[in-house]
Structure formats: structure tokens, C-alpha cells
């Protein structure tokens, strides 16, 4: 809920990013960030929920930025760096986006692990623990992640409950955040 107090205008968002994330960023870099992470509700997180869950004008924008800068950009950077050096698998949860007001939230991907309704991750965790491979007879085919083929097991509410997708969402924004992290390490 901290996002409610961070910013209510585009200028406040950019001031917050500059003050707390990139105090040495150029105006051009901040303008690029402003373009890649717009305040348009339909383009914010949780994604693919339209204007739902837009508690404030900047809420979904800040959620998209924070999700990418804290989770997706570092994850993708390390998965690409380790590609071809060790076995990798990735997953994306698109479950629980219908939670009123907030949509999916940090940690919501863990609920299905302990649910009777979904067993994919639970079974995959057991297979991985025993075999260093999440694939098994009760898990949908889960191809390895590589830089050339960044496959992810994507989890959905409803049917189908899973699908294999590519880890190519928001590529330009995630790559830009990675370049900022390298240039301005925290």
C-alpha cells in the first residue's frame, strides 16, 4: 500500500524514481523510463486487467515499475547469463488477477502450491528436489529456459491451467532497467 503515497502525478513518479533509485540518471534516461512505464492504467500491473485495480492514477504504473525492477529484470538477467551453463526453468503465474482492488499480489503465486485445486508446482517441486528436473508424469511438459528459447511454464486460473509461453514480455522496459542497474548499482 506504500504505492498509494509515492506519487499521484507523472512528475512525482519521476521525482521518486530519481530520488530513490537513480539520483545520477540523466534527464534523457528518466524520459525513456517515463515512456516505457506510462501512467496509462491498462498498461500497468497487474497486467491484462485493463483499468481494474487502478487505486490511484499512478498505482499500476508504480506496480509495473517495481515488479520489473525488483523481480523481472534481475531474474531475466541472471537466467540469460546462466543460459547454457546450467539447467534452468522459469515460470510465470497469471493466477488470482481477479482479487478485488489489488489484483494478484506478491506471494499470490504460492497459494496454489498449497491448494487442492492446483498441483503443478507442488509436484514440480517434489520432482525437482529428487531429480534436479521439475518434469514428471503429473507435471505438464516444462521445457528448459535458454536465451535462445526463453520458455516459461505459465499458470492460469481456469482451463487450461498451464501453457508454455516465451519470456519476452516488456522486453524493452526490462532491458532498459537492467542497463540502469548496471550503470547505477544500488
Put a short name on every predicted segment.
Residues 83-86, 120-186:
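Alpha/beta-hydrolase-fold serine-hydrolase catalytic core, especially in secreted/extracellular enzymes
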Residues 1-118:
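Substrate-gating cap/lid region and adjacent catalytic-acid/histidine neighborhood
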